[in-house]
């Protein structure tokens, strides 16, 4: 049944549209007129005329052409008539009985200053909105992400970077919480980095970067929160867009956004199909040392081809119960079939670098990932402005199945089977009560309940002493209650909050009949203060207590292998990391230039870190060095830094923006483990000091220029600085993206040529030391490239939509910290 769901969703949507447009046998009349801008008498193309029959309650209407004229055929009857246009004040004409053709003449609309900053449309440039507890980056008309995915979008957001494996970091910290529409979501999937690559960029409206979250948000994510807000059609009538992308290496994508809105309902949808097949590679040179002398070495040269077929559908219906309340139901479905073929050429050498052994290890992997999510939202805006109640329910069911066959000449083929299934249930209620003109009280509850099973099977088992097969059950229930109070006193505003979270975790290892259950209850205070020095200058100060919960794969003690000599295993003794975060921000608008700077500091205890240790194991009849990578709780980490972003609109044809982040992290901690020497059969207790200080930086520059013949040119340059830890040194990475776009078909269509990673330089080069850099017994020199340079051509066509040539109301740079919205 679940495999037929995409067809059912599409049938439901198209059937609804057909019924909405069924003609009747009543006599039709013609209604004509012209809609213009009040100040200039300029015609308004795509203005919407809405007709509501007072007897049947049917909604009909039409839109104006490029000269502002409309000509609507409609049955005779009595109608409520309104004329609407985005960011303009709507006009409600008197209810009237229409029995014959009528010309309404010229209808003038005036701009609505209160709604200028609420326009949901693809604008010319990404803009910045600063509030007490978050910054909002509107995706806008960003050519470099056309035909891309959510990872591409996040990598273009200031303060955010995405590494070559798809891991997302905020201000250099990878422990960032990613939400979809303000809630944990199945769209992030069981494997977050991979799932983000399957979410089309065209489906994203904006990204909220929350470095000092208020009490309304989850306490999880020591770096902060990234909230991805999806597009939902808001314009009246039937409208939408179609996007198609082709590229090399093999890429094809087709996506549609369809919307049908009337007075009582809004039906919106996103459908997408994506196929990709791309090469990648890695090279590893591993050397073993004794007293500083090389005793053996190993070279692994790996190439692969990743293949994906992905379909996603998101269909929602918003029903307006009253003018103040609405009910919205959404169904999301995604299915991805993937394949990964890799060849790993292995060469082994002795202490004199004489070749002692060669092998080729081939892995052929197929996967099937399926997710369905149901969401229901009720919103009631009471009569008093800002008085609001929202209730949410969300349920998701995800399944991931993978089968990998490992082949090596001279040995029996090995099959790895992974079956994972997860259900998530979320219940949430938020209540906002204004008290007077500048005061606000808020309270709410969130329940987040996750159940997961993971079954990993290896056949046959070559070494019974190290059988990696395992079956794990994981359950995590979180109950959260919060309250917050906000006030504005002249130029000052503040938002004080307190959140209580109770977490119950149950881990079952079915193969060994082991249980690992634990519970904890913690308080998380938040403070956000704003000061509006002038109309163009503002300051913010934020404090929040955060945590990082260990994920189920970090708690699973059974082993999984990246290769024969590199093994990852979880640690069931992990406990959460707790972080105190402070953030001081400054915003200044100087003519065409906008500057946003901040200084931040974070102190973490029981910091979760991945470490590497060495074991000697028998592999194919030989004693070989094996690297075991596992997570542990280090003592503490202090992280502080400075960042700034800037926008400069030199003219309508030339725009620049950039960001820079400089940070330092200091880690303290001791790692103790047992080392068994197979020659003497003696166990030695090894103690490694993993204390370290690392200074690094990130920089991004973006330029957009309008060339002759109305061709848009955009270039994005980014640099991810080098990083160091007690066991790793990673070199800096420079990359560049380039795009050209041209409006066609009377600006209803857009062609975009995009070159991602122009210089094919997006590679990770790292040195890994075991046990540490001061006294290594192993040094691994690795180069890794997830995907190569990509060239794509995207075409998008909009119907019943207006392409905005310039964002009305100027830059939406912020409210100076006046808002209380969390």
Give residue ranges: language-model regions:
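Transmembrane beta-barrel wall of Gram-negative outer-membrane proteins
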Residues: 30, 250-278, 293-341, 370-372, ...
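Short, acidic, small-residue-rich periplasmic hinge/interaction motif at the N-terminus
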Residues: 36, 40, 48-52, 84-88, ...
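Short, acidic Ser/Thr/Gly-rich low-complexity loop/linker segments typical of extracellular
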Residues: 53-69
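Short acidic/polar hinge/loop motifs at secondary-structure boundaries
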Residues: 73, 150, 156, 183-211
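N-terminal periplasmic accessory domains that precede
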Residues: 105-108, 150-151, 192-194, 209, ...
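Face-selective signature of the C-terminal outer-membrane beta-barrel domain
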Residues: 312-336, 361-510, 532, 593-599, ...
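Surface-exposed extracellular loop regions of Gram-negative outer-membrane beta-barrel proteins
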Residues: 399, 504-506, 531, 535-581, ...
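Outer membrane beta-barrel strand-and-loop segments of large Gram-negative receptors
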Residues: 424-428, 468-480, 571, 575, ...
């Amino acid at each position: 049944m679940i495999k037929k769901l995409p067809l059912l969703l599409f049938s439901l949507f198209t059937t609804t549209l057909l019924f909405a447009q069924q003609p009747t046998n009543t006599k039709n009349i013609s209604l004509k007129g012209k809609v213009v801008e009040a100040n200039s008498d300029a015609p308004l193309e795509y203005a919407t005329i809405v007709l509501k029959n007072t007897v049947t309650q049917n909604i009909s209407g039409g839109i104006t052409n490029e000269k502002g004229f409309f000509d609507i055929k409609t049955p005779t009857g009595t109608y409520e008539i309104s004329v609407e246009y985005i960011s303009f004040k709507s006009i409600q004409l008197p209810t009237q009985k229409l029995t014959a053709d009528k010309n309404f003449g010229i209808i003038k609309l005036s701009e609505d200053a209160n709604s200028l900053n609420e326009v949901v449309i693809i604008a010319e440039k990404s803009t910045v909105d600063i509030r007490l507890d978050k910054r909002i980056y509107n995706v806008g008309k960003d050519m470099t992400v056309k035909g891309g995915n959510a990872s591409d979008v996040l990598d273009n957001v200031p303060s955010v970077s995405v590494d070559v494996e798809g891991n997302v970091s905020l201000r250099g910290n990878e422990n960032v919480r990613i939400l979809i529409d303000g809630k944990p979501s199945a769209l992030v999937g069981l494997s977050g980095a991979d799932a983000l690559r399957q979410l089309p960029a065209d489906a994203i409206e904006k990204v909220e970067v929350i470095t000092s979250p208020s009490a309304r948000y989850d306490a999880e994510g020591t770096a902060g929160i990234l909230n991805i807000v999806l597009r939902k059609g808001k314009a009246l009538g039937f409208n939408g867009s179609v996007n198609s992308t082709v590229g090399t290496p093999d890429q094809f994508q087709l996506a549609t956004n369809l919307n049908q809105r009337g007075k009582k309902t809004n039906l919106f949808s996103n459908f997408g199909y994506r196929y990709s097949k791309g090469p990648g590679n890695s090279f590893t040179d591993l050397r073993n040392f004794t007293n500083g002398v090389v005793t053996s070495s190993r070279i692994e040269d790996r190439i692969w081809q990743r293949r994906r077929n992905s379909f996603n559908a998101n269909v929602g219906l918003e029903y307006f119960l009253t003018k103040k309340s609405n009910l919205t139901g959404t169904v999301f479905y995604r299915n991805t079939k993937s394949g990964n073929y890799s060849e790993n050429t292995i060469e082994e050498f002795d202490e004199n670098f004489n070749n002692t052994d060669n092998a080729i290890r081939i892995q052929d992997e197929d996967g099937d990932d399926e997710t369905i999510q149901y969401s229901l939202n009720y919103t009631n805006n009471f009569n008093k402005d800002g008085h609001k109640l929202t209730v949410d329910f969300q349920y998701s069911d995800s399944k991931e199945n993978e089968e990998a066959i490992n082949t090596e000449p001279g040995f029996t083929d090995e099959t790895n089977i992974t079956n994972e299934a997860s259900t998530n249930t979320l219940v949430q209620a938020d209540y906002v009560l204004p008290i007077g003109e500048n005061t606000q009280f808020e309270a709410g509850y969130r329940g987040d309940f996750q159940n997961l099973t993971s079954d990993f099977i290896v056949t046959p088992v070559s070494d019974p002493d190290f059988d990696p097969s395992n079956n794990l059950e994981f359950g995590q229930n979180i109950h959260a209650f919060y309250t917050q109070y906000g006030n504005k006193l002249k130029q000052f505003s503040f938002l004080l909050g307190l959140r209580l979270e109770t977490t119950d975790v149950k881990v079952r290892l079915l193969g060994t009949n082991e249980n690992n259950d634990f519970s904890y209850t913690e308080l998380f205070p938040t403070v956000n203060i704003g000061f509006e020095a002038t109309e163009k200058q503002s300051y913010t100060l934020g404090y929040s207590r955060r945590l990082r919960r260990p994920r189920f794969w970090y708690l699973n003690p059974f082993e999984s292998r990246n290769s024969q000599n590199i093994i990852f295993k979880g640690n069931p003794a992990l406990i959460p990391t707790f972080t105190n975060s402070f953030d001081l921000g400054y915003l200044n608008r100087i003519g065409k230039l906008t500057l946003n700077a901040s200084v931040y500091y974070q102190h973490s205890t029981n910091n979760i870190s991945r470490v590497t240790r060495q074991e000697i194991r028998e592999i194919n009849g030989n004693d070989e060095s094996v690297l075991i990578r596992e997570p542990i709780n280090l003592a503490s980490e202090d992280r502080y830094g400075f960042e700034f972003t800037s926008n400069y609109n030199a003219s309508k044809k030339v725009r620049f923006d950039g960001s820079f982040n400089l940070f330092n992290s200091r880690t303290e901690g001791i790692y103790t483990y047992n080392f068994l020497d197979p020659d003497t059969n003696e166990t030695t207790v090894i103690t490694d000091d993993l204390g370290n200080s690392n200074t690094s930086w990130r920089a991004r520059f973006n330029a957009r220029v309008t060339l002759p013949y109305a061709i848009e040119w955009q270039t994005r340059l980014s640099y991810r600085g080098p990083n160091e830890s007690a066991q790793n040194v990673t070199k800096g990475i420079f990359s560049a993206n380039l795009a050209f776009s041209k409006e066609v078909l009377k600006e209803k269509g857009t062609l975009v040529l995009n070159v991602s990673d122009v210089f094919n330089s997006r590679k990770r080069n790292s040195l890994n030391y075991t046990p540490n850099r001061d006294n290594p017994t192993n040094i691994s020199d690795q180069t890794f490239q997830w995907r190569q340079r990509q060239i794509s051509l995207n075409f998008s066509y909009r119907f019943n939509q207006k392409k905005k040539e310039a964002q009305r109301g100027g830059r939406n740079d912020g409210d100076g910290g006046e808002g209380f919205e969390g």
